[in-house]
Swiss-Prot record:
Biased composition range(s): Low complexity: 671-695
Biased composition (Acidic residues): 302-332, 401-430
Organism: Emericella nidulans (strain FGSC A4 / ATCC 38163 / CBS 112.46 / NRRL 194 / M139)
Bias type Polar residues, positions: 11-20, 68-78, 138-153, 831-847
Coiled-coil regions listed: 415-636
InterPro entries per the UniProt record, alphabetical: Fungal_stress_NST1, NST1
Location of this chain's protein in the cell: Cytoplasm
Keyword RNA-binding: no
Keyword terms, alphabetized: Coiled coil, Cytoplasm, Stress response
Annotated Basic and acidic residues bias: 484-494, 504-637
GO cellular component labels: cytoplasm
Designated name of the protein: Stress response protein nst1
Signal sequence interval, chain numbering: none
Biased composition (Basic residues): 39-48, 123-134
């Protein structure tokens, strides 16, 4: 307690005034209605207190009014119902309102006039005056020894260990230190005081005394420093020492007396100053007892005792929060009487009044006591009774502290009359009484002040306890929070563990399901693999089975192919055997023919030799005869007058033909037939007849015999002996052509004739002469009636106007000196010796014959029909054994019926026959498409030169295409340029060419990638039949397939044929090679295709005069590229 007591200091006046001012600002008068009854008043009072406390809590943010906060919160107002009477006083003080020392919950007692509107005017004035005095004293009143306690601003040091004893702390812990009522607080204060030790109590008293002395010194510091004032201060201090010593003695005595009773039971009497603990702040003492005025050291009674009595009665009724009823359960009536017996006097009120105005009244009272003591001492010394007043009045210094007094102080003493009244009353009292009254007043004052000190110490202890409790509660709350957080953490951990366990269980379940699913999938996969393996095995077995079947089919197919190849090979062998036999047969036939030819040649040579000898003999005879005639003529010239006897001359050479009376058309005899009788068995007897020509066939050129000069021995013999046939190769110029020398240069040696200058026909043999001789026109078309006499062409035209196939006689231009010398037309002759190009026995062109003696005139040919009929067998045999033996091995000999059909001029009507296998050298409108000219350099055919009897070149025909002196003959062929007849082609070659062309046309017309170039043999056969000439015999399928098996070469078109068996039958495909690509379109029959000849003509290939070209012939006039002989 010793460490605690020095901290309690008295506040400075400025601090006290500031606290009081702030507390006044928070306090407000509280009007109350007049209660109807005691119980209702108490109820209303409690309700009002609770309502005000709630409002203050809401406005200031403090704890409720019934609690005492350590940091300045409100505490419940302590109310002590004191009701004591003084015999001399005449009024009762029934209640006193004590407020909280902190000043937050300050509550003023309303003036009695507020509850009594029916009071008199004098009472109202007194109340107003008392209210003014109270308000004036509030401004500067501060209790001297009560310090301001604010735990929030200045922390208190802890109390001693005695304060925290086990019994006290245990008792306080059992009770609520936060919510304490007034009765509980009183009990706690009393317990606190009794628990204090002697030293602690003495220390509290000493602290209070020092605070009072300090306050008095502060109040007197502005006073003068004279001896009187010094003595006064010394007297005051001595008086205080005596008073506090006496007060402490009384406290010790009370404490010692009550200590035993406190320990024994609840009947405890309070100390003299503890009858009513003033729970109010130092600045709030003026709020309670402001209506009492100081008595200047004397106790006086107010003028109107009844008013005061009524005022206190009203105060008891209005401000009675703690009535006797509230303590009936706590204390007995005797204990309450002893407890409240200390303050049942008017002096308590006066002592409370002395505490007003910051202890100023108390200081004044102490000064008065000191002055009286000094006056008493002076009176004792000088014996002057009234020294005190004179001494006091003679002191002229100013007031002790003018600054501390307010203007309202004058209002506390309204008139001079009241002051005179108080002085008179004090003078009436004895000095002893005044001293006793002063001491008593000091004791009461000291008790009041000490109560405040004890209350302050108690509150400090309570504050520390509450602070400790708060700390404990905070710690406990913190512990609770920690425990709660730990519990939450544990719960969270439990939840996490639970979740983790659940998750683990879920994962295990998931893993189990996955494992089960994987096992199922593995089983399903194994089952699927097993099924796949079974399927693979099945497929493998099926594949092996199919492979075996395929192999079997391939073996069967290979066997069939082998059989087919074997059959084809056997068939080919048979065919080869047949061909070999045929070839052997042909060879044998050829040998026979050669033997026959050899025999014929020998016979012919023999005949020729005989004929030559005969001709030579005749020539010699003729020469000798002519020599004789010449000699005779010369002799006659030398002797003109002499008439020589000349021999008999032969008949004239220009014989006139004898026309029979009934001329009948007779078939012209072929030149080859005229000389072939000698080769027959009966040719010896008919040799003379063979040289004779019928009168109809006598040429006009015989008239040239009369132009032989009678003189001209120097001229060369132009004609050989008639008996010797002239060979075409031994002539000086080609037969039928004039000598190559120009006119007038006959003596020059002519150049040898070129191969292409050998014409076939005489240049001047006209169509009508040929008809007279029984030969058809060289072009194969007889001249129509009325056309045998033709007019000559004008000299300006260089070519004859002859339509194709209808030759007109064209007079050559230059018919003057450049005309060829006429020569005799040859008669029938014997066969010429064979050379490199033998003429076919079927050739219709007339052969040149040597000029012979004119034969005698005979009968017309119609008279010799029987003779010719009897010789037909000889002609047939001659055709078979003669020129037929010279045919190629592959050529098929034609019969006499075919020959008769193909020979032009054999029919009476002018028929235009189609081409046949054996084409003649005579010109035809429709040459054989399969033929090829063998004699490219020899104009065998009359169509080489264009017009048959065009103008002959005087100096020999130039090379083809070169300019000559003669005019260019017109082209008589249907398609322009002269087309050579091709050599005779065998049937297999022709069929193979047709098959090649058919395959190419089918590939062009219907190309198909899927077929691979293969075509159905039936379609190929149909195409071949379309391409086959109409006069050719039909081709069978077997013949075509057999020919397709032959190998290709340059003659049959080349390439190879592939034959395979398909679903629809056999298929054929042509595969060309280098030979087939170079030969080109050998068998092309369509003009305009690649390889076909370019049509050219000097005149339109239309019909001539009244004759057109047959439409079908246009597709037949072509030729393929030649392949040589």
């Amino acid at each position: 307690m010793s460490s605690h007591v020095p901290a309690v200091t008295a506040p400075t006046p400025s601090t006290v005034s500031e606290n009081s001012a702030s507390k006044d600002s928070h306090s407000s008068p509280m009007p109350e209605s007049k209660p109807v009854s005691v119980n209702r008043k108490k109820q209303k009072r409690r309700e009002k207190a609770a309502r005000l406390a709630a409002q203050r809590q809401a406005a200031n943010g403090h704890a409720p009014s019934d609690t005492l906060d350590v940091n300045g919160s409100s505490s419940t107002v302590l109310d002590n119902d004191v009701s004591h009477e003084q015999s001399g006083g005449g009024y009762d003080d029934k209640s006193e309102k004590v407020l909280n020392g902190h000043g937050h919950n300050t509550q003023e007692l309303p003036h009695p006039s507020e509850h009594d509107p029916q009071g008199t005017t004098s009472r109202k004035s007194k109340k107003k005056r008392g209210k003014k005095g109270r308000n004036g004293s509030q401004a500067s009143s501060t209790p001297m020894s009560t310090p301001s306690i604010s735990l929030s601003n200045a922390p208190r040091p802890p109390l001693s260990s005695h304060f925290g004893s086990q019994s006290s702390s245990k008792l306080l812990k059992e009770r609520s230190i936060w919510n304490t009522s007034t009765q509980e607080e009183r009990e706690n204060i009393k317990t606190f005081w009794l628990e204090l030790g002697e030293e602690e109590r003495r220390q509290l008293v000493k602290v209070e005394k020092d605070a009072v002395l300090k306050k008095m010194k502060e109040q007197q510091k502005h006073s003068c420093s004279c001896t009187v004032c010094g003595r006064k201060r010394t007297a005051i201090e001595e008086e205080l020492e005596v008073l506090y010593d006496a007060y402490y003695d009384e406290l010790e005595q009370y404490a010692n007396n009550t200590q035993g009773s406190f320990e024994r039971g609840p009947a405890i009497l309070p100390p003299p100053g503890l009858y009513q603990p003033p729970l109010r702040s130092p600045g709030q003492h003026t709020h309670t007892h402001g209506q009492f005025h100081p008595s200047r050291g004397r106790i006086h009674e107010p003028e109107d005792d009844e008013d005061l009595e009524e005022d206190y009665d009203e105060d008891e009724e209005d401000d009675e929060p703690y009535s006797d009823e509230e303590y009936e359960d706590d204390e007995g009536s005797a204990a309450r009487a002893d407890f409240f017996a200390f303050g049942n006097s008017l002096t308590v009120k006066v002592a409370d009044d002395l505490l007003k105005n910051d202890g100023k009244h108390f200081i004044d009272m102490m000064e008065q006591l000191a002055e009286r003591r000094m006056q008493r001492e002076e009176d004792t010394q000088y014996g002057i009774a009234a020294a005190h007043q004179s001494l006091h009045s003679s002191h002229n210094h100013g007031p002790l502290d003018d600054e501390d007094y307010d203007d309202e102080e004058d209002e506390d003493y309204d008139s001079q009359e009241e002051e005179e009244y108080e002085e008179d009353e004090m003078d009436a009292m004895t000095e002893e009484q005044r001293m006793e009254e002063g001491r008593r007043m000091f004791q009461i004052f000291a008790a009041r002040m000490f109560e405040q000190r004890v209350l302050t110490a108690y509150r400090e202890k309570v504050a520390e306890q509450r602070q400790q409790k708060l700390i404990e509660e905070l710690l406990e709350e913190e512990n609770l929070n920690e425990q709660r957080n730990a519990k939450k953490a544990r719960e969270a951990q439990k939840r996490k563990d639970k979740k983790r366990l659940a998750k683990l269980a879920k994962d295990e379940e998931k893993a189990r399901r996955e494992a089960q699913k994987a096992a199922e999938e593995a089983a399903a996969k194994a089952e699927q693999e097993r099924k796949l393996e079974e399927q693979r095995k099945k497929k493998e077995e099926q594949r092996k089975k199919r492979e075996a079947e395929r192999k079997a089919q391939e073996e069967e197919r290979a066997r069939k192919e082998a059989e087919k190849h074997k059959r084809l090979r056997e068939e080919r062998e048979r065919q080869e055997e047949a061909e070999r036999r045929q070839r052997e047969q042909k060879e044998q036939e050829k040998k026979r023919r050669e033997e026959a030819k050899r025999k014929e040649r020998e016979e012919r040579e023999l005949r020729e030799q005989k004929a030559k000898q005969e001709r030579e003999r005749k020539a010699q005879d003729e020469q000798s005869r002519r020599e004789r005639e010449r000699v005779a003529q010369e002799q006659a010239k030398r002797a003109p007058n002499l008439q020589p006897v000349s021999p008999v001359s032969p008949p004239p050479e220009s014989a006139t033909p004898v026309v029979s009376k009934a001329p009948t058309p007779a078939k012209g005899r072929r030149p080859s037939q005229q000389g072939s009788h000698s080769s027959s068995p009966r040719s010896q007897s008919a040799s003379a007849e063979a040289s004779q020509v019928s009168p109809r066939s006598a040429p006009l050129s015989q008239s040239s015999g009369s132009s032989i000069p009678k003189y001209g021995s120097g001229h060369p013999i132009l004609h050989p002996h008639p008996g010797a046939p002239m060979s075409p190769l031994g002539r000086t110029h080609p037969p039928g052509l004039s000598p190559s020398n120009p006119p007038g240069l006959s003596g020059l040696v002519p150049r040898p004739p070129m191969g292409h200058e050998l014409p076939t026909y005489p240049p001047h043999s006209s169509p009508y002469m040929n008809q007279l001789r029984g030969f058809p026109a060289p072009n194969g078309i007889p001249v129509l009636p009325g056309m045998n006499g033709t007019r000559p062409m004008p000299p300006g035209r260089g070519f004859p106007l002859d339509a194709p196939g209808i030759p007109f006689h064209a007079q050559p231009p230059f018919s003057g000196i450049f005309s060829p010398q006429p020569s005799g037309l040859p008669h029938g002759h014997s066969r010429q010796p064979s050379n490199s190009f033998e003429r076919s026995p079927l050739d219709t062109s007339a052969q040149p014959f040597p000029i012979s003696r004119p034969s005698p005139i005979k009968r017309p040919p119609s008279t010799q029909q029987e003779q010719r009929n009897s010789r037909r067998d000889v002609d047939d045999l001659s055709a078979q054994l003669g020129s037929s033996a010279l045919l190629d091995d592959s050529d098929v000999p034609l019969t006499s019926s075919q020959l008769s059909q193909s020979l032009p001029g054999t029919t009476p009507a002018p028929v235009m026959p189609g081409p046949a296998r054996a084409s003649f050298a005579g010109s035809s409108l429709f040459p054989d498409p399969l033929s090829v000219a063998k004699h490219a350099n020899f104009p065998v055919s009359p169509v080489i030169g264009g017009s048959t009897w065009g103008a002959q070149m005087p100096f020999g025909a130039p090379f083809p295409g070169g300019p000559t002196w003669g005019y260019t003959p017109a082209n008589n062929n249907a398609f322009g340029a002269g087309i050579h007849h091709r050599a005779h082609t065998s049937r297999p070659v022709a069929i193979r060419l047709l098959v090649i062309q058919a395959c190419k046309q089918l590939s062009t017309m219907s190309p198909s990638k899927d077929s691979g170039g293969y075509h159905d043999v039936n379609a190929v056969l149909r195409q071949v039949e379309q391409l086959r000439p109409s006069n050719e015999p039909s081709i069978s399928l077997k013949e075509m397939l057999d020919i397709c098996d032959t190998e290709g070469n340059a003659q049959n078109g080349g390439g190879t044929f592939s034959i395979k068996s398909g679903q629809t039958g056999e298929l054929v495909k042509f595969e060309p090679d280098a030979v087939s690509t170079t030969t080109g379109h050998r068998g092309s029959i369509v003009p305009g295709e690649i390889g076909s000849p370019i049509p050219s003509s000097t005149m339109p290939a239309l019909g001539g005069i009244g004759l057109g070209t047959p439409p079908s012939s246009a597709l037949r006039q072509f030729s393929s590229p030649t392949t040589g002989f």
